[in-house]
């Protein structure tokens, strides 16, 4: 028998051949044992997993189909890395909220998280102290008290949106994007947006689209072989390009902080600091003067910047979905306007103080969020940090956990006839105690609907799963919900939003990507009466006066 205890360079050829066979065999055996212990899913191929079975377009639809075959929790494999897909809100809540101490991290994202952002963004930060610091700072702008302070801004911006549609109804998408962007920039930096041609808006959309392009499974080999991140830039042009974009975004973020720093300095010189609008960036800069914030200037600048991605584009996409829902389900517009006419009347537009009395409008906002969730795959995936078991299945540490919001929000066990847009699902004050009612029941608005209130009770208070779960839930969820309420309430009070006669609308025709919105469509947006127009013109004057203190960013 050959002695192989000596240096490997002296080993016989058959020893090397044996190792070449044994190592893959042992690896395959280990993966197979793990595969059998995890929630069952489509059979993976050795070493490449289910890559060949993953669709290049709209994977959430395929994931929904697999849930019908394999159940509400199953596993797919990207190479040798397991991903648990969840299609039931109760399971998502159990794992990512009840057991949040185990499921609040992020999978490693080399291209986007490490090369582009160098770990600065809270979006991709693993769960731990550094994430907690950023989350705490971000929450300073999103406390209940802070959210109340932003309501006048949101009302004024919603009035500008409603007035803008008088002269530019065909530009409703751009006007909506201006509205959502301006709200977020007022909150983050104390400056408004008057036009999408503003330089800062062009930059934000460029950064957002580029980062999204990096977060595509299989696009970069570095996600499978992380060691490739250490290849010198001159040998890896793809890496050089990513880092170049990262430096550009970081510089833009720090420029915005410098703008607010300059605002504070001028206000102090002029003894007019009380006139300077509060913003997250202003609050953080003042905090930095009195306490230690363990972040570099670069990392610090990413905190207020993160509000744009969390609350601007996604809210605009939801508003576009609302328009699509209204023109394909015209009975909802009639019901909404019946409530608005009864509660508000013709002499003013709705305000936040009316929200408690506008139960149908509140329900409509929730149904929009449920019907076509923007973050179809639940936003950025979670990752487990400890070995765990669920219903007898093994979930090892390091598993990517993905809540398929598309499948969850369209789960027929919770939402009968789920593709029918029906705000009445959310009219019951206690959503968790919904009771199935007979179809075509007449409600107090005089509207007839298939109430579709049967099914299981959703575990969350909101009744849907569109903002994520647990410690990783979207921090701007309440800010976004407030913007949706006030904008839709004012627009439905003022306008008839209807389909073009003879036009067919496809409610499944949405963009690609991890955040979706309807493909561009035309509709009729017509002011309801001359009196409504006069009210909008008057409220526009008040809105412009209020927003004067929020200096606009230039083009």
Regions found by a protein language model. Name each.
Residues 2-117, 129, 133, 152-160, ...:
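N-terminal membrane-proximal hinge/A-helix region immediately C-terminal to the signal-anchor transmembrane segment
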Residues 43, 202-208, 269-282, 325-375, ...:
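Cytochrome P450 I-helix active-site segment
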Residues 58-84, 105-126, 136-193, 250-270, ...:
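Cytochrome P450 catalytic-domain "roof"
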Residues 105-115, 148-319, 335:
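Cytochrome P450 heme-thiolate monooxygenase catalytic core
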Residues 120, 305, 352, 391, ...:
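Cytochrome P450 heme-thiolate "Cys pocket" and heme-binding signature region
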Residues 180, 314-332, 337-339, 478-493:
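Cytochrome P450 catalytic-core helices
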Residues 330-332, 477-523:
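Cytochrome P450 heme-binding "Cys pocket" and the immediately downstream C-terminal segment
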Residues 403-454, 540-541:
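Conserved cytochrome P450 K-helix/beta-meander segment immediately N-terminal to the heme-binding cysteine loop
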